[in-house]
Amino acid sequence: MIESQRHSYHLVDPSPWPISGSLGALATTVGGVMYMHSFQGGATLLSLGLIFLLYTMFVWWRDVLRESTLEGHHTKAVQLGPRYGSILFIVSEVMSFFLFFWASSHSSLAPTVEIGGIWPPKGIGVLDPWEIPLLNTPILPSSGAAVTWAHHAILAGKEKRAVYALVATVLLALVSTGFQGMEYYQAPSTISDSIYGSTFLLATGFHGFHVIIGTLFLIVCGIRQYLGHLTKKHHVGFEAAAWYWHFVDVVRLFPFVSIYWWGGT
C-alpha cells in the first residue's frame, strides 16, 4: 500500500549523523583543552575529533543534497527552513565581528597607561594601510559582483555562464587569501605583541577564516552547478553561499577603515 502525504514538509529518515557530530564536537573540545594544557594524548584526541567532525559534516551534507537534488523532497515550504537558518547564522556572525571591532575600538580610543597612553602602543610596528591592505580591499567586493553575476545566470537558466562566474568568484577569493597571507608574512608584530597585535590579528584572522570557508562553499556550488544540480527554482545552497559571501566582502571594508587605516596610524 502506497502512503500518501498531505503536506509539503519533508519528514526525514532516522540518521546517525546528529549523535556522531555531537561526539566529534565533544572530542574536539576536550582534546583542544587537553592540548592547550599539555596533557598527554590531547593532540591525538583533538585530531581524531576534528577528523570525525569533518567526516560527519561531509556525509550529512551529502544526504541533504541527495534528498533535495535526487529525491525532490525540498519543496518551497522546506526551502524556507535553510533560508531562515542561513539568515540567522549570518546575524550571529555579525555579532561576532562586532565583538572584535568593539575590542579594537575600546583599546584604541582610550589607551591605558600600560601601553604608554598612545595607539598604536610605543615600539609596536604596524602595517602600511596603503600597500597590500589597500590592494586587497577591492578584491572581495569585486568577487561579490561576480557571485551576483552567477546568481542572475542561474535564474536565467544560463548554466555555463553561471559556472564561469563562480570560477571568477573563487579565483578572486584565492587572490584575496594570498594577499592576506602576504600581509601576515610581512607583519612587524605578532598576536602576543600587546593589545594591538591581539586585536589586529584576531579581527583580520577571523575575517580571513570566513573568506576560506566561503571559498570552499562557493567551490562546492561551482561543482554542483557544473553537474547540473542547480536550477531556477532549486538553488537554496547557492543562495546561502551568495548571502554569506556578500556578508564577507562587505565586512572587509570595516577592518580596513577602523583597524588598518584609522587604528594603525
UniProtKB/Swiss-Prot annotation:
Q: Which GO terms describe its biological process?
A: mitochondrial electron transport, cytochrome c to oxygen
GO MF annotation list? cytochrome-c oxidase activity
Where in the cell is the protein located? Mitochondrion inner membrane
The family line of this record is:
Belongs to the cytochrome c oxidase subunit 3 family.
Q: What is this protein called?
A: Cytochrome c oxidase subunit 3
Q: Which residues cross the membrane?
A: 16-36, 41-61, 84-104, 162-182, 200-220, 242-262
Gene Ontology annotations for the cellular component aspect, listed alphabetically: mitochondrial inner membrane; mitochondrion
The annotated subunit structure for this chain is:
Component of the cytochrome c oxidase (complex IV, CIV), a multisubunit enzyme composed of a catalytic core of 3 subunits and several supernumerary subunits. The complex exists as a monomer or a dimer and forms supercomplexes (SCs) in the inner mitochondrial membrane with ubiquinol-cytochrome c oxidoreductase (cytochrome b-c1 complex, complex III, CIII).
Q: Which organism is it from?
A: Zea mays
Record field: catalytic activity = 4 Fe(II)-[cytochrome c] + O2 + 8 H(+)(in) = 4 Fe(III)-[cytochrome c] + 2 H2O + 4 H(+)(out)
Name the UniProt key words of this record, in alphabetical order. Membrane, Mitochondrion, Mitochondrion inner membrane, Translocase, Transmembrane, Transmembrane helix
Tell me which InterPro entries the record gives.
Cyt_c/ubiquinol_Oxase_su3, Cyt_c_oxase_su3_dom, Cyt_c_oxidase-like_su3, Cyt_c_oxidase_su3-like_sf, Cyt_c_oxidase_su3_a-hlx
EC number(s) of the enzyme?
Answer: 7.1.1.9
Entry function:
Component of the cytochrome c oxidase, the last enzyme in the mitochondrial electron transport chain which drives oxidative phosphorylation. The respiratory chain contains 3 multisubunit complexes succinate dehydrogenase (complex II, CII), ubiquinol-cytochrome c oxidoreductase (cytochrome b-c1 complex, complex III, CIII) and cytochrome c oxidase (complex IV, CIV), that cooperate to transfer electrons derived from NADH and succinate to molecular oxygen, creating an electrochemical gradient over the inner membrane that drives transmembrane transport and the ATP synthase.
| Membrane topology listed for this record | Multi-pass membrane protein
Gene this chain is encoded by: COX3
